[in-house]
Amino acid sequence: MAHANHFDVIVIGSGPGGEGAAMGLTKAGLKVAVVEKESSVGGGCTHWGTIPSKALRHAVSRIIEFNSNPLFCKNNSSLHATFSTILGHAKSVIDKQTRLRQGFYDRNQCQLIFGTARFTDAHTISVTQNDGTEEVYTADKFVIATGSRPYQPADVDFNHERIYDSDSILSLKHDPRHIIIYGAGVIGCEYASIFRGLGVKTDLINTRDRLLAFLDNEVSDALSYHFWNSGVVIRNDETYERIEGTEDGVIVHLQSGKKMKADCLLYANGRTGNTDKLNLPAVGLQGDSRGQLKVDGNYQTEVEHVYAVGDVIGYPSLASAAYDQGRFVAQAITKGKADGYLIDDIPTGIYTIPEISSVGKTEQELTAAKVPYEVGRSSFKHLARAQIAGKDIGSLKILFHRETKEILGIHCFGERAAEIIHIGQAIMEQKGEANTIEYFVNTTFNYPTMAEAYRVAALNGLNRLF
């Protein structure tokens, strides 16, 4: 029995990081088990984060597209939906993703163990199953890929039926007419787009002086303007003093003296690593104040046989990066060293309505570094494909070195921005002289396409040189 419960590697968590590690390890011939605390695989990415929020966004954007299409407006037709009704679309996508990922484990003969894991000593974990029974498993090595969860400050009553975090909002049963979103990071801005797109009065409380300050200033300003134009009320530089749940809603008392009232509140201000229930001291580890673990270049923790990947190690906290980290940790375990590493310029995709995506440096970063750069711009309203699709809001901006023509940064705001960015990323990742803005002038694009924005922006930028 003890032999059957011993593995070469046990991976704790079946999100993107855990999946990447497990697949790499099983394909290398190791005996691997994956422990998942929920009843199905996929982790927070599949069940509460990336997949459901993007499915919701897609449904809302299609409703907006229908209602703004002149073909339907002429017939006085209008399509309406509530948050609770479009949740059905998100759940169908979650089910498909879960079945797909379950198949990966089945085909690769990777054992799945459902339950909550905690360390009991350096090489042993105890897994508590849903029925309360416990089973003990041992392994030579461990990979912690437990992800993160929404941060919940102690002075906010998340048990109140009208106060939600970004996980529990997916269980919203009523249909609010007015919502306050506290926290204007990526998650807060994405949900602001979703609720406003459904016609819900939306107030967005930002604890900083501008939205998504890590973005290029022009893109951040474009998002702020688009929110303002669509009716989202943004309160910058505000912090709550207390959040009061009432019988019919929520009142937010701000430190500035203002008060805000709505049917419900979505608290979306920060996340914390899921390490508190692992009993890390038993294996010689300790998470930091945010529940995160420190790792080296091989994703090895301070304990030699324990590795960690994904949100639980902090930046960049992206599903795409977590999967790559999982692959790299599998290489580190099987070969002693990871063959690859995360690229320096990881693209950012923000699924607001419209989308935002960027890769490389911002204008403010290049200006601070005194880099002689130039800017090439393309407005979507001038692209035939955007006009045909009725998606003419947005632009593409290319930042490049005035002397070498090297592409330094790309920033996109508009329909399919998260897809469009990868064209430029592919050229940016080329070595030496192959990374040049002139590529977009000298190549031939399909017409009409959104990708043609690169040619327009490149010509615009090169024409600025003298």
From Swiss-Prot:
Top EC class of this enzyme: oxidoreductase
Protein family: Belongs to the class-I pyridine nucleotide-disulfide oxidoreductase family.
Residues annotated as binding FAD: E36, K37, E38, S39, S40, V41, G42, G43, G44, C45
EC number: 1.6.1.1
Cofactor binding comment, as recorded: Binds 1 FAD per subunit.
One CC-aspect GO term: cytosol
Secreted recorded as keyword: no
Name recorded for this polypeptide: Soluble pyridine nucleotide transhydrogenase
Lineage, top ranks: Bacteria, Pseudomonadati, Pseudomonadota, Gammaproteobacteria, Vibrionales
Main location: cytoplasm
Flavoprotein among keywords: yes
Swiss-Prot/TrEMBL catalytic activity: NAD(+) + NADPH = NADH + NADP(+)
Gene3D superfamilies reported in the protein's UniProt record: 3.30.390.30, FAD/NAD(P)-binding domain (3.50.50.60)
One of the protein's GO biological processes: 2-oxoglutarate metabolic process
